[in-house]
Amino acid sequence: DHFKRVNDTWGHATGDVVLVHLARMLKGNLLRSHDLAGRLGGEEFAVLLPGTTAQEATAIGERLRRALEQSHIRAGDGTSFQVTMSIGVAPLQGDAHATLAQADAALYEAKNTGRNKVVLAQPAEAAPEKTP
């Protein structure tokens, strides 16, 4: 959350330290060996959790959120600070683009309702059947 503030306060090198810290957390023991995490761009990451229910994925997201919140990161000038993150969770339903869009909507709900939380995407409405 407020990643731009980190860059504006301590510079892009410290922003990179935050991104590397989060990447190391994702590669560490917070995810299972068959989970897959990757950076989408900027400060956005995606985590694929195969064989996981929406409730289990939300719990994993909460574990990640808490771990980052409790971390202490050191800026280039030696200042120690903490960061938080908002997480949007969406079960795979249909194609990957639709799932990412649902996760993104849940992420923005988390940001718009106070940040530093995990939000599970609401089920997509069923599309009306097409007639020939």
Question: Which functions belong to the PLM regions below?
Answer:
Residues 12, 58-61, 90-132:
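Catalytic-core segments of nucleotide cyclases and related cyclic-nucleotide turnover enzymes
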Residues 28-34, 66-78, 109:
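Short catalytic/binding micro-motifs of nucleotide second-messenger systems
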Residues 8, 48-53, 69, 92-93, ...:
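Residue-level recognition of strand-loop junctions within catalytic nucleotide-signaling folds
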Residues 42, 84, 115:
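ATP/adenylate-binding site constellation spanning eukaryotic-like Ser/Thr protein kinases
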Residues 45, 85-89:
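A structural signal for short, well-ordered beta-strand segments
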Residues 39, 68-85, 99:
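Catalytic core regions of nucleotide second-messenger enzymes
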Residues 4-27, 38-42, 46-47, 54-62, ...:
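Conserved long alpha-helical elements within nucleotide-processing catalytic cores of c-di-GMP signaling
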